């Protein structure tokens, strides 16, 4: 079995490309892979987002607004997760496409329109958005990210249980994530090669304990 933790900016254009392209190549491993997509909000990820959008990172008001925006989008994504893997991933990709790529304003109307397109329960979604459960799930994701040493988005941690290792491989940034399909091969030699090539950190399996394995997206 392969366990993948993918950390993203829920309205990030770079994260959109990472999810849409490389992850589509993982479908042939569908029976072996458990994928979890977790939103990440921290100073570094917000800074990267601002830089990509040509925002002044020294503008504290602008930084605060961007942080709140990513946080709100993260809660919306976590609320969508409560309605299942297909709805959540569809909603996430729509958010990233419209807000991150097309640069539409993140608004109540847009969120409702995009969620309605997923065929999820809109009334339930609106109730869940600010619920304590959703906030708790979001904070759990931030704890997992911290334990795994995640600082930027997109990043991923891959556990290949077919290899004799009790740690995962950390891929930081879009370029590193190009190695994701190769890490899903069950060859121990291949895993070791990519591990050396990327000089990656080694998160321990203990970090898996804080993750809700019911929220599996692939």
PLM segments and residue spans:
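N-terminal cysteine/histidine-rich coordination modules
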Residues: 1-6, 32
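Generic hydrophobic segment detector
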Residues: 2, 52, 65-97, 185-218
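C-terminal cap of thioredoxin/glutaredoxin-like
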Residues: 5-7, 21-26, 102-218
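Short, thiol/selenol-centered motifs that function as redox-active sites or metal-ligating centers
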Residues: 9-19
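Short beta->alpha junction loops/turns
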Residues: 11, 81-84, 131
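Flexible, glycine-rich phosphate/dinucleotide-binding loops
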Residues: 13, 44, 165
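Structural alpha/beta surface segment adjacent to cysteine/selenocysteine redox centers
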Residues: 17-103
């Amino acid at each position: 079995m392969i366990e993948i933790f993918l950390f993203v900016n829920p309205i990030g254009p770079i994260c959109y490309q990472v999810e849409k392209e490389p992850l589509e190549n993982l479908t042939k491993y569908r029976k072996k892979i458990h994928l979890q997509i977790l939103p990440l909000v921290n100073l570094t990820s917000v800074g990267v987002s601002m830089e990509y959008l040509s925002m002044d990172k020294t503008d504290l008001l602008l930084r605060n607004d961007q942080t709140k925006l990513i946080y709100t989008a993260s809660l919306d994504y976590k609320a969508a997760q409560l309605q299942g893997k297909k709805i959540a991933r569809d909603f996430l990709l729509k958010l990233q496409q419209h807000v991150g790529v097309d640069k539409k304003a993140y608004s109540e109307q847009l969120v409702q329109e995009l969620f309605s397109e997923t065929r999820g329960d809109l009334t339930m979604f609106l109730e869940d958005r600010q619920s304590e459960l959703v906030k708790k799930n979001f904070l759990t994701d931030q704890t997992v990210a911290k334990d795994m040493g995640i600082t930027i988005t997109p990043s991923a941690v891959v556990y290949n249980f077919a290899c004799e290792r009790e740690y995962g491989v950390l891929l930081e940034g879009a370029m590193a994530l190009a190695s994701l399909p190769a890490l899903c091969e069950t060859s121990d030699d291949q895993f070791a090669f990519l591990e050396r090539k990327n000089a990656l950190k080694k998160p321990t399996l203990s970090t898996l304990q804080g993750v809700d394995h019911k929220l599996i997206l692939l």
